[in-house]
Amino acid sequence: MSQGPPAVSVLQRSVDAPGNQPQSPKDDDRKVRRREKNRVAAQRSRKKQTQKADKLHEEHESLEQENSVLRREISKLKEELRHLSEVLKEHEKMCPLLLCPMNFVQLRSDPVASCLPR
């Protein structure tokens, strides 16, 4: 089993990197605070993104349900239209008002009365 280089902290690597000036503890502290602040901001951003995705998912589900309800209503209304059209067609075959020729020629003042049974 080969051993890798000894574990070195991120701060130590930045100090040991070529071209870097040795940093003061104050600079190190500032860097740690900045990284912590960045980490917290990243967590907040991920949380916000997750919440937004959850909200969109809920809205999608709600719209799907509404769509389903509306499709069922359309189906019922189409069936009702079909039924009422059939009823009307059957009624037209035997309606005395529609069969009366006086409905089409306006000779009297009250053409409906002449078609009604006496």
UniProtKB/Swiss-Prot annotation:
A GO cellular component annotation in the UniProt record: nucleoplasm
Region listing for Leucine-zipper, in residue ranges: 56-84
Lineage: superkingdom: Eukaryota
InterPro entries per record: AP-1, bZIP, bZIP_sf
Localization annotation: Nucleus
Entry comment describing in which tissues the protein is expressed: Highly expressed in CD8-alpha(+) classical dendritic cells (cDCs), with low to absent expression in other immune cells and non-immune tissues.
Annotated GO biological process: dendritic cell differentiation; myeloid dendritic cell differentiation; response to virus
Region (Disordered), start-end ranges: 1-69
Disrupted-gene phenotype: Selective loss of CD8-alpha(+) classical dendritic cells (cDCs) and CD103(+) dendritic cells, without abnormalities in other hematopoietic cell types or architecture. Dendritic cells are defective in cross-presentation, and mice lack virus-specific CD8(+) T-cell responses to West Nile virus. Mice also show reduced priming of CD8 T-cells after pulmonary Sendai virus infection, with increased pulmonary inflammation. Mice are extremely susceptible to T.gondii infection, with decreased production of interleukin-12 (IL12) and interferon-gamma.
Function: AP-1 family transcription factor that controls the differentiation of CD8(+) thymic conventional dendritic cells in the immune system. Acts via the formation of a heterodimer with JUN family proteins that recognizes and binds DNA sequence 5'-TGA[CG]TCA-3' and regulates expression of target genes. Required for development of CD8-alpha(+) classical dendritic cells (cDCs) and related CD103(+) dendritic cells that cross-present antigens to CD8 T-cells and produce interleukin-12 (IL12) in response to pathogens.
Protein family per UniProt: Belongs to the bZIP family.
Miscellaneous comment in the UniProt entry for this protein: The increased protection toward L.monocytogenes infection in mice lacking Batf3 suggests that CD8-alpha(+) classical dendritic cells (cDCs) and CD103(+) dendritic cells are an entry point for infection by L.monocytogenes.
Stated name of the protein: Basic leucine zipper transcriptional factor ATF-like 3
